[in-house]
Amino acid sequence: MSRVGKLPITIPEGVKIGLNDLEVKISGPKGELSKTFKGNIAISLAENKLLVKPLAANKNARAMWGTARSIISNMVTGVKEGFKLKLEINGVGYRAMVKGKYLNLMLAKSHNTKIEIPSDIKIEMPKQNIIILEGTDKEKLGQFASIIIKQRPPEPYKGKGIKFENQCIPRKEGKKN
């Protein structure tokens, strides 16, 4: 029995939910999200609570049960409050700028890296070495953050690179003579 899947999702005020078989549409003050689920699950709405139940007793149905419940819960939180990720850029001369709909990264390469910003993600830059990402879809936000981090992941000797705000980088000792 899924400990996550059996919990009901309470729907806060200002959030509307539309169910069409396995398609869930959620709209709120921050925007609208929709997702179609595949698998052996049933989604029902009763008294301001959303319930997810498995249709079969096999391993795949139980796995999708908890996953679907977590995804729907994140969608509800996203349209109500939104999600925020903070990235730090460490290194001499490493910085970022937003130009139009592109994020321009200067990361000690022979060229600047341009990454197109998705339409549903907002970028704020209080400093040149801090990037704050905001959006309603937690999955897309994390995916975009990983694309940015992949351009220059943090290295263990000096800690240079792009990392999440409170991410701990295990440090290694350098060469000894």
Curated annotation (Swiss-Prot):
SUPFAM superfamilies given in the database record: Ribosomal protein L6
* Gene Ontology terms: biological process: cytoplasmic translation
Which cysteine residues pair off into disulfide bonds? Answer: none
Tell me the keywords, alphabetical order: Ribonucleoprotein, Ribosomal protein, RNA-binding, rRNA-binding
Among the Pfam families in the record, one is Ribosomal_L6
Q: Which GO terms describe its molecular function?
A: rRNA binding; structural constituent of ribosome
Identify the GO cellular component terms for this protein: ribonucleoprotein complex; ribosome
InterPro entries, alphabetized: Ribosomal_uL6-like (IPR000702), Ribosomal_uL6-like_a/b-dom_sf (IPR036789), Ribosomal_uL6_a/b-dom (IPR020040), Ribosomal_uL6_bac-type (IPR019906), Ribosomal_uL6_CS (IPR002358)
Does this UniProt record's set of keywords contain Lyase? no
Q: Tell me the protein family, please.
A: Belongs to the universal ribosomal protein uL6 family.
Q: How does it assemble?
A: Part of the 50S ribosomal subunit.
Q: HAMAP family of this UniProt entry?
A: Ribosomal_uL6_B
Please explain the role this protein plays, according to its UniProt record: This protein binds to the 23S rRNA, and is important in its secondary structure. It is located near the subunit interface in the base of the L7/L12 stalk, and near the tRNA binding site of the peptidyltransferase center.
Q: What is this protein called?
A: Large ribosomal subunit protein uL6
Protein's organism: Rickettsia conorii (strain ATCC VR-613 / Malish 7)
